[in-house]
């Protein structure tokens, strides 16, 4: 069965954590799994950009107890055997501020546990840990992967976030370097490296086995979650780690 809850934790803003969470969920859905993606990055609200149509209830409403988590789930359109439901943050500043309280963080943690009981996997999109809801997200997750952009800024931020996760009793299990273009030096501490994905790239890429990034995402997903999805790719046949 493997791990049921995975948190991608950004080392910096703009590390690509949201896209990585969505692509990981899509990879799992291609393997036939039901996946929920929860946005704990209340300030940036990046997951909301992946939702088509109107967003009413959101992750902050769930955290405040104003809406059940069912009302804050939105389907991601996929060509896959499984499904992905997104729980985005999409709220005015006043509600964002209230949703960052310790009580709201505990409510969000309860909602994540509820989703873990109903879905095969839950993937959490977490900002650099500096607020209550981020702490709740990383402590409730079974596996935590730090996401670091391949840059000097990312390399500098990585030790700080590693230390912060240790301080709250939720150490990182892996490091994922993003934005790799093949021209610069590899991040030596990275367990997985993911190529640069342009902002204009189709969403998601992981469900198309012909894309170069799909097998890379599959390898990372299988390793982080301890599963064998049995995915196939055009060049390599049956995929295995």
Task: Describe every region a protein language model picked out.
Residues 2-44, 220:
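Walker A/P-loop phosphate-binding motif and the immediately C-terminal alpha-helix
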Residues 198-222:
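C-terminal boundary of histidine-terminating zinc-finger modules
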Residues 113-202:
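Conserved catalytic-core segment of NTP-binding enzymes
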Residues 12, 40-116:
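P-loop/Walker-type NTP enzyme "switch/lid" segment
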Residues 5, 37, 84-86, 175, ...:
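Conserved beta-strand scaffold positions in the cores of enzyme catalytic domains, especially
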Residues 1-5, 167, 173, 177, ...:
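Acidic-aromatic/histidine active-site loop/patch
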Residues 21, 107-108, 130-131, 158, ...:
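Amphipathic coiled-coil/heptad-repeat helices and related helical stalk/stem segments
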Residues 2-4, 31-34, 56-57, 81-82, ...:
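Short coil/turn connectors at secondary-structure junctions
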């Amino acid at each position: 069965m493997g791990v049921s809850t995975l948190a991608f934790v950004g080392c910096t803003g703009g590390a690509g954590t949201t896209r990585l969470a969505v692509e990981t969920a899509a990879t799992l859905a291609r393997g036939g799994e039901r996946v929920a993606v929860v946005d704990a990055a209340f300030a940036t609200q990046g997951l909301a950009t992946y939702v088509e149509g109107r967003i009413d209830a959101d992750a902050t409403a769930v955290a405040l107890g104003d809406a059940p988590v069912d009302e804050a789930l939105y389907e991601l359109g996929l060509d896959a055997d499984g499904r992905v439901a997104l729980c985005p943050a999409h709220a005015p500043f006043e509600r964002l501020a209230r949703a960052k309280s310790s009580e709201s963080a505990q409510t969000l943690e309860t909602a994540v546990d509820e989703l873990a009981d109903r879905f095969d996997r839950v993937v959490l999109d977490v900002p650099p840990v500096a607020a209550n809801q981020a702490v709740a997200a990383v402590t409730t997750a079974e596996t935590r992967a730090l996401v670091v952009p391949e840059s000097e800024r990312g390399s500098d931020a990585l030790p700080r976030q590693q230390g912060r996760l240790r301080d709250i009793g939720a150490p990182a299990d892996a490091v994922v370097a993003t934005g790799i273009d093949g021209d610069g030096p590899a991040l030596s501490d990275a367990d997985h490296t993911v190529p640069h994905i342009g902002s204009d790239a189709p969403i998601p890429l992981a469900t198309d086995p012909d894309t170069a990034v799909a097998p890379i995402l599959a390898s990372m997903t299988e390793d982080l979650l301890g599963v064998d999805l049995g995915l196939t790719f055009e060049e390599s046949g049956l995929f295995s780690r």
